[in-house]
Amino acid sequence: MGKNWLTCVSVACLSPGKDKKNQKPEKPKRKWSFGKQKSRESFDFPLEETPPVDPSPSSVHRPYPPPPPLPDFAPQPLLPPPSPPPPPPAYTINTRIYGESKESKNRQALALASAVAAEAAVVAAHAAAEVIRLTTPSTPQIEESKEETAAIKIQNAYRCYTARRTLRALRGMARLKSLLQGKYVKRQMNAMLSSMQTLTRLQTQIQERRNRLSAENKTRHRLIQQKGHQKENHQNLVTAGNFDSSNKSKEQIVARSVNRKEASVRRERALAYAYSHQQTWRNSSKLPHQTLMDTNTTDWGWSWLERWMASRPWDAESIDDQVSVKSSLKRENSIKSSPARSKTQKSASQSSIQWPVNNDTKSRKIEVTNRRHSIGGGSSENAKDDESVGSSSSRRNSLDNTQTVKSKVSVETTSNVSNAQTVKPKANVGAKRNLDNTKTLKSKSSVGTTGNLANTEAVKSKVNVGTTSMPKKEVVADKKKPPQMVLPKKRLSSSTSLGKTKKLSDSDKATTGVANGEKKRRNGGSS
């Protein structure tokens, strides 16, 4: 049996096809194939006769028992035995025409050896499968089959799931490609790319600016620290006295240091002198608070500066002369401005020249100056000391006081002139109006103002009564007082108002008498 099966395999491998057999011998191809077929067929017959090439079943296959019948669930063999082909017809080949070559023999031998080896491998595989099937028991085969079927089902389900997922992914990719290929998507993508470019450009600019600002801040802080260290070093050198950073020369620096030393010495001397004078004032017989609280004295409420200025009458007289000159110039200007004013001023000047100076004002002025000299020191030595002590601040205060006095004198002169002009037409009207004016002047004179004095002076000049020079002389006497008496004047107004009102009342009586006499004359003339 094995011999017949091997011959069938060799014939199937080496024999030509049926179409080659049915071909006509006229064509050259058929001649070529026919020659090959003859050579092959001529080579087959002696192989069957030679014993080494023809394999016997005893040498190749071992005798095995027939296999038992397979159950229904057993797997079928992988390679079923091929059906033996029909035996080829016998051909008589003339071996003499076609010579056999050694190469063809070697090829045939190799082909037969390979075929035998393949057959042996197939038989060995079948035998191994049969041995395994026979040796394994029947029960575990059933359990393994269930597990295998379950694994197969699981694998099939998982493969289906993966296939569906891959299909879904492929469909999504196809849709995405179709969308990307559209015009709207292209425009959108271009716009997005341009905006992304601008955003990246802005971000880079902002980052560069931040880096630049941080670097500038670092350099600024470094410079500030360096300047601070330089200032500290400079201050240390200056405090130690080893360095002077000014751009001045050596002589200028030395002169500045000398001036500073002299100024410090002067300051110390002034402080020491002021302290010593404070002690002398405190140790005086009359305490300063007693003089301030004493209302009988004319220097009530003076400060030490006013007392010091009162002890310098020569300065006060020079200031009063300047004030009188300025007031006279202002009066001349006012006289030139209006003819009515010029007439009143001429009459007032004539009356003032004819009227003698009152001795009471002179005595009062002498008493006031004596008192001031007694309070301020009363001697020329104290005055000299005060001159040495007087600083720039005291001189400035004295100048300010003189300016205030000048302004007050100018205001008084202008008010006197204006009041004189207003009273003049009123005196020409009649006696009744003169009486009314005198009544108003009496009521105002109780207050002790300067306006009443001016009104009475104007009325007296109109009636040709020689009483107009007295108040003007009093004003001139008041002008000659020192400029530091501005504050005491306000406080002394209440004490001196009584004397002034008495004088005003006498002058008013005279004016009223003159007015009554004129009225009687008019009445007599009319009758």
UniProtKB/Swiss-Prot annotation:
Q: Where does the record place it?
A: Nucleus; Nucleus, Nucleolus
An example Gene Ontology molecular-function term? calmodulin binding
**Where along the sequence does the record place the motif called Nuclear localization signal?**
478-485
Which residues fall in a compositionally biased region of kind Polar residues? 335-360, 399-422, 437-455
Residue spans with biased composition (Basic and acidic residues)?
Answer: 17-26, 361-370, 471-481
Question: Any idea which UniProt keywords this protein has?
Answer: Calmodulin-binding, Coiled coil, Nucleus
Any GO CC annotation of this UniProt entry: nucleus
Q: Where is this region: Disordered?
A: 13-90, 323-527
- Provide ranges: composition bias, Pro residues: 63-90
Q: Does the keyword Nucleus apply?
A: yes
Coarsely, its chief localization is nucleus
Which portions of the sequence form the region Calmodulin-binding?
Answer: 256-273
- List, for all copies, the residue spans of the domain called IQ: 147-175
How is this protein organized at the quaternary level? Binds to multiple calmodulin (CaM) in the presence of Ca(2+) and CaM-like proteins.
Role of this protein: May be involved in cooperative interactions with calmodulins or calmodulin-like proteins. Recruits calmodulin proteins to microtubules, thus being a potential scaffold in cellular signaling and trafficking. May associate with nucleic acids and regulate gene expression at the transcriptional or post-transcriptional level.
Q: Of which family is this protein a member?
A: Belongs to the IQD family.
Specify the protein name: Protein IQ-DOMAIN 4
Q: Which organism is it from?
A: Arabidopsis thaliana
- Which gene name belongs to this protein? IQD4
